[in-house]
Amino acid sequence: VFYPVARGKYFASIEGDDYWCDPHKLQLQVDFLESHPEYAACVHNTVIHTCGSAEPDRPYITALSGDRDVDFETVMLGMGKAYHTSSLMARRELMIDPPKFYYTAYSYGFGDQPRAVWFALNGGIRFIDRPMSVYRVRSNPQSWSSNLDRHYTQLKRFVQGELAMIDDLMPFLSGENVEIAKD
C-alpha cells in the first residue's frame, strides 16, 4: 500500500475509470480539513453512471441529505457504501501504520470499509452533499460490482472478510460501538 511512502498532508482516492467532475473538489476538501483538524477525512456525493445503458445517472448516496458527519454506525451498516472511494480525501498520517483490522480486510480483497471505520474512530468523516466525482458501473466486466453480481464465491469471501475484520476491530471499540459492530 502506498500510504507510508506518500508525501503530503492528505491523500485523495480515485480508481479505474472513475473520475472527478468538479474542478474545485480538491481545494474544497483541503480547505475543510485545514479548518477542521479534528476530522480524519472529508467525502462528498458521487454520481453513478451506468455505461451502455439508457438508465439516467443517479446519486451514489441517497440516505444522507445536506452536509453532515458520517459516524461509525453509518460506516458499519453501510457495508463499505457510506461514501464512494472517488470522493475520499483524508489525513495521510492515519494510514502510515493502520491497525490490524485494516490488513485483515485488505487480505480478503477490500479496503474501503476498514479505512472508513478507522477514519470514523479517529475524528470522524465529513460528508459534503455535492456530487464531485463519477462512478462508472459495468464499464469493465472485471470490476468489483460486476464480480459481486456474478460470483457467489466473491460474495462469500467478502462476508468472511467482513467477519474477520470485525473480530480484529473489537479491541478498538467501546460502549454502543461494540453493539453496532456485532449487529
Where are the predicted features?
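Glycine-rich, basic loop-to-helix element that forms the pyrophosphate-binding segment
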Residues: 1-7, 28
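Short aromatic/hydrophobic "clamp" motif used to bind/position activated sugar donors
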Residues: 11
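Alpha-helical elements of Rossmann-like donor-binding domains used by nucleotide-donor carbohydrate transfer enzymes
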Residues: 24-32, 114-118, 161-164
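C-terminal, non-catalytic tails of nucleotide-sugar-dependent glycosyltransferases
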Residues: 84, 89, 155-182
